[in-house]
C-alpha cells in the first residue's frame, strides 16, 4: 500500500487516494477472511493481507482532520478503530467470521465516499 500511495500522492488528489485506500482495505479484508476460513491458504498471503489491512486503517485514521471534521471525523475514527481491534482479535483467534462482518461496513463507507464530489 505505502509504495502505491507514495507514488500516487504526486498525481492524484486526496479524494482519490482515500478511495484507493478504502478499496484496498476492502480487498485485503476479503482476502484475510478467506485465508482464515481456508486453512490451506499460504501463510505469507494471510500475513500480508493482515498487515495491509492495518496499514490501510492507519492511513485512513491519519487522514482525518479531527478539528474540521467534527463529529463525522470522530465517528469515522472510532469506526476505523473498531475495525483495527476486530482485525487483530480475529487474526489472533484465527476466526474469519468477525472479519466478514467488517466488509459491509467498509463497503458502506466506500459507497458513501463515491458520492462525494472531489
Report each predicted region and the residues it spans.
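Amphipathic, charged alpha-helical scaffolds that flank and support histidine-based chemistry
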Residues: 87-103
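Short, charged, low-complexity loops and linkers
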Residues: 2-15, 33-40, 62-66
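Amphipathic alpha-helix face/heptad-repeat signature
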Residues: 14, 18-25, 46-52, 72-79, ...
Amino acid at each position: 500500500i505505502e509504495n502505491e500511495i507514495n507514488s500516487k500522492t504526486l498525481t492524484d488528489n486526496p479524494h482519490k487516494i482515500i478511495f484507493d485506500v478504502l478499496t484496498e482495505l476492502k480487498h485485503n479484508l476479503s482476502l484475510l477472511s478467506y485465508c482464515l476460513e481456508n486453512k490451506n491458504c499460504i501463510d505469507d498471503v494471510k500475513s500480508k493481507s493482515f498487515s495491509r489491512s492495518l496499514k490501510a486503517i492507519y492511513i485512513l485514521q491519519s487522514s482525518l482532520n479531527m478539528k474540521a471534521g467534527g463529529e463525522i471525523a470522530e465517528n469515522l475514527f472510532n469506526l476505523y478503530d473498531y475495525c483495527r481491534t476486530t482485525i487483530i482479535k480475529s487474526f489472533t483467534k484465527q476466526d474469519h467470521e468477525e472479519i466478514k462482518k467488517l466488509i459491509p461496513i467498509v463497503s458502506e463507507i466506500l459507497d458513501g465516499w463515491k458520492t462525494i464530489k472531489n
